[in-house]
Amino acid sequence: VPVELAANQVQRGATARSQSSRIGSVAARAADAARHEDDVGVLYVGERGVDEVPTAGSFHGADAVADTDEVGSVELIEHARERLALVGRHPWVQHNGNLHVRSLPRFAIAATSSGIQRCGRNLYCATMGTSVDIDRDALRTKYREERDKRLRTDGNEQYVEVTGIFERYIDDPHVESTEREPLFDEVTVAFIGGGFAGLVTGAKLHEAGIDDVRIIEKGGDFGGTWYWNRYPGAQCDTAAFVYLPLLEETGHMPSEKYTHAPEILDHSRRIGRHFDLYDNAVFSTEVTSLTWDDDARRWIIRTNRGDQMRARFVAMGTGPLHRPKLPGISGIETYRGHSFHTSRWDYDYTGGDPSGAPLDGLADKRVGIIGTGATAVQCIPHLARTAEELYVFQRTPSSIDVRNNHDIDPDWFTTLQPGWQAEWLMNFTTLQTGGFAAEDLVKDGWTDISQRIRDKVLSNPGQEFTRETFIKAYEDSDDEKMTEIRSRVDALVADASTAEALKPWYRQLCKRPCFHDEYLDAYNEPGTHLIDTNGRGIERIDAAGVWANGKHYELDCLIYASGFEVGTELSRRSGFETTGRDGEQLSDHWAGGMQSLHGIHVHGFPNLFMVTLSQAANLISNVPHNYLESGATIAAIIDHALQVDEAEGSEVTVEVTADAEQEWVERLEAGAVGRMTNSPDCTPGYYNNEGQSTGRRGVLNSMGYPEGPVAYFQYIDRWRSSGDFEGLEFQP
């Protein structure tokens, strides 16, 4: 492709300026040489005396190789693209703040021998392998200042619940609910929730020969959060090979490394079809109560459709990412323009579709979007390209690292051996949680975080590995990573003041890390305006628009990218109360914090199974992996109960003993350590309960297996495979 390049200086030190100038000159000369080669897309530039210039046989990360002394002769690598496709990814290297690159329509820039890294749309950035001097004391001070200006005493109460006059924000825009007769039948297993938790558990039950399963879903189809989230640009930020469950079982090959929402929704439907889960499912149906009938030894499930179903076993996987929340901004109810939440995107108004078609309905519209979290990062580039004027109201910027997405090569995919997905899952989890593996199969931003920490630890051979040395390694590597991320903002955003406002001043894991190659570019669009509130948030909303920083912005459309209810009570998020033996409600049982065995079983609630992250693996970066293990465990227990039925000649109930529940909680609590997201270096967000202390209750609600996810997955596999199901009672 044609190569355009602009290089400039961003570091102030004389050495850095000299280095930047030199590299900029080299890159420009190499790019100029590449313009004469029709097949060249990405250049490699090495420096004599620093690193040996690689040959075509040793480096497959570029389409061309050049040497600083011989940039006029560009050697093409014959099968570079094929090799890249073969390994399924680009090389991963660090972005270098010494090289300042302005975003131009189509270009690539030079890279050193460490490789190349895509840092924007049609943009590749270089690494020099040089360290950046960081004043860590000044950085801590800056982090605390940014945190303090955002702290609020109301925590989660700053958000508005979508009830009453706001209930329209949760209407289903995808289907029209049709009337049906209420159901009064009985099933062996009912699962509440049709997302990946329900689909995976249903699949595991099907594999165990248990087919009398009903999934109850409030959406119009399977998919869970991916049924609701169809905003433009919606995409998973965990690699599809480990995020999409049951790929081998369904025979599906992801089309790209980070799949977009339409494909994820299609895969949810594929799982439903493959395992016959549609046969007995009910959609557009919300559970209103779940009550244990001790005489009948059945769960009674009541819904908003008048149903009163009965189920011997019930599993719950309602998840936190389906119930939207609105910002509690004064006057929000007075706005008279068009408005919607990103999880209920109104394509009838904006034009376009979930596949990425232009939002041509906004061509003459002044659009405001509130929020700059993971959802906003993905949809803002689409809004910026089409809206006449786009106003992005920001309280806290997200950290935006490289995504480096690419298509998957079908020929390479066919080389994967049976059992590959289980191997990739454990490889990803091992590396992402600080373990060691011979190879990084996924190679993404998540595993890079842990790789950096390991590199820091290993850089001091002989040093005793303790929690303190780990934290020190984490802090040092994070300081360097966040410095790179902030430098990347300078490299991609043309306006200096906008770039400064987009820089995240906190640790990378304080908030959900974002990976995107077009978001920062969006602020170079002439009609896109960042309205940074310096942590204060919007002042108020009126009938015509938004007040921020003492200025009024008239808007035709206001979009809320304000996220979901994550830290609220389970009964509030799920929309129903669960009542167990002797009339005890689950919310009362958990009044002092979650109590369970494996995050699945709760004493006093027989034949009930929970699918959660807490008090189990608690793997946040790849949630479906948790579901695979929980689903397999639930299926094994129900299958065992049915076998006991046959052996005993009567039905049994399954329940964790009070002692086993208490022992499990005590074991986890004894090993719980302070979460890094609760440090003074972290700005408020849903990762840390909006910066509010939660005490012991919060620890119980969020703690996981002390030895980590990998150890938990190994433990739970041994536990369910033993056939003893220690801690459970199967009572006739």
What are these regions (language model features)?
Residues 202, 206-207, 380, 384:
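Gly/Ala-rich phosphate-binding loop of Rossmann-like dinucleotide-binding domains
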Residues 198-199, 376:
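N-terminal Rossmann-fold NAD(P) dinucleotide-binding loop
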Residues 14-20, 42-43, 51-53, 64, ...:
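Hydrophobic helix segments
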